[in-house]
Amino acid sequence: MQQLPIEKYDELLAEKCRKLTALLAPFDAPALTVFPSPTQHFRMRAEFRLWHDYSENRGGNLYHIMFDKTTKQRYRVDQFPVASQLINRMMATILPLLKEQDVLSRKLFQIDYLSTLSEQIIVSLLYHKTLTDEWQEAAQALKVRLRNLGFSVQIIGRATKQKICLDQDFVDEELSVGDKKYVYRQVENSFTQPNAALNCKMLEWAIDCTRDSQGDLLELYCGNGNFSIALAQNFRKVLATEIAKPSVAAAQFNIAANQVDNLQIIRMSAEEFTQAVNGVRAFNRLKGIDLQAYECHTIFVDPPRAGLDSDTVKLVQKYDRILYISCNPQTLCENLQILSQTHRIERAALFDQFPYTEHMEAGVWLMRK
């Protein structure tokens, strides 16, 4: 079992606080609000390579493995305390069942897990072979056995140019945010926030920052609607963009499931939306959507690790209030070099989404000077 340095958690978090405070110092940021993580079982998704060991017996054995970042050597993982308890239970349960069936275990090279606080889990089995009807029958029987053992599980098989979904390729998460509960459909192989407890804290912080806002909200990179659905209560209307089709479909479901009636999602990238707003080119996807009907005084961005491109930074700068969540404080600070010319940081936060690593999730709330 991989041991976590739980006794060092506070020390590691304090070091992150020092680093982020130093990064934000040139921008006169106020003191950080710090949101610690649970010290174990905080990660809702995990992926492992599979090792077939034929040295132990004729049937061979099957193990989850990971690779040491320094030596690149593989090591066996029977329990993974970083991951949710549900993932750990599934890890221990599924391998013996897979091993019983050659059609399920042969050429299986990776298992991905996606779990929820609502106790649902997707298990994706990745193969170096074509998946047949025989595989599908065996996988269906495996699913029944796991359900009989108390798991609310979906099983997906993947191979080159193949995806076999036995029932559905999503789970429905329930998050408690303040005094409200939100339902979020999460699709296999699409982005979701990995640390559910910290996601709830990020949503609460974002809601608190934008309380008593005037006008409308624009969100770029909305994913499955994680933030825009929770923030919609603070605005007259919300316009959100997302490029990935599965995420857009999940967002539309989530809008209906949470009975949000003031949120419109458009399938386009942040870069395309910038072109549309600036009149550089027209998009069929915007037919029927009157951008002039929105009075967006606030913009929310949660970009990929690369941060915002220069054109999008200029677009963001046009708004009076900017809420920026970043998974890479280095690129956040690069963007702040420009944004700080017109805006000041009113609030700053550190969300410890990734304990025991150097990765930091930061949030800043900016107002026009």
From Swiss-Prot:
Domain of life: Bacteria
A GO CC term assigned to this protein in UniProt: cytosol
Sequence positions that bind S-adenosyl-L-methionine: 193, 221, 226, 242, 302
Record-listed E.C. numbers: 2.1.1.-, 2.1.1.35
Active site residues per record: 327 (nucleophile), 361 (proton acceptor)
PROSITE patterns (alphabetical): SAM_MT_RNA_M5U, TRMA_1, TRMA_2
Keyword Transit peptide: no
HAMAP family assigned: RNA_methyltr_TrmA
Function as written in the Swiss-Prot or TrEMBL entry: Dual-specificity methyltransferase that catalyzes the formation of 5-methyluridine at position 54 (m5U54) in all tRNAs, and that of position 341 (m5U341) in tmRNA (transfer-mRNA).
Family statement drawn from the similarity comment of this UniProt entry: Belongs to the class I-like SAM-binding methyltransferase superfamily. RNA M5U methyltransferase family. TrmA subfamily.
Protein name per Swiss-Prot or TrEMBL: tRNA/tmRNA (uracil-C(5))-methyltransferase
Name of the gene encoding the protein in the UniProt record: trmA
